[in-house]
A protein has these predicted regions:
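Two-component system phosphorelay core
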Residues: 1-88, 92-94, 98-143
Length: 143
């Protein structure tokens, strides 16, 4: 499903034509929006979000966030009952998600944070599984 501004951009005909690369980038951005990742709510909101360079940088930043070491560190700190380090990791992940306009993780992050505060390893791991499943889906659609 494409959002209206992307449909408008994709349907431009005549003297202005989009490159194949721009079409692929627009499709990736539209897929990201389906997962609650919106470039217009990110640190790029003041830039021309239909610019090929801006879209490329944004997609690269989202991809890097999805595979960043902080997710692995969070899992390790929870498994080792290092609650203070886990709390720091979840705060850093949430801050980075907010910068990139990734809203789909906030509910899960709140669940992980609550489990960390209660020192409930089982609940924290269950919430982390939800986050990891979402990450896998997002990365699959990003190509």
């Amino acid at each position: 499903m494409y959002y209206p501004e992307y449909i408008r951009k994709l349907s431009v005909r005549g003297s202005v034509s989009m490159s194949a690369r721009e079409q692929v980038l627009m499709k990736i951005i539209a897929n990201l929006r389906r997962f609650g990742i919106d470039i217009s709510n990110s640190k790029f909101k003041d830039k021309d979000i239909e610019n090929e360079v801006v879209m490329t940088v944004y997609i690269k930043d989202v991809r890097e966030y999805m595979v960043c070491y902080d997710f692995i560190r969070l899992e390790q700190t929870i498994n080792n009952s290092q609650w203070s380090a886990a709390y720091t990791s979840i705060n850093r992940l949430e801050e980075n998600a907010r910068e990139l306009g990734i809203n789909s993780f906030f509910k899960s992050f709140d669940g992980i944070r609550g489990a960390i505060i209660q020192k409930n390893m089982r609940s924290a791991k269950q919430s982390l599984v939800v986050v990891n499943n979402k990450k896998t889906q997002i990365l699959k659609y990003m190509g």
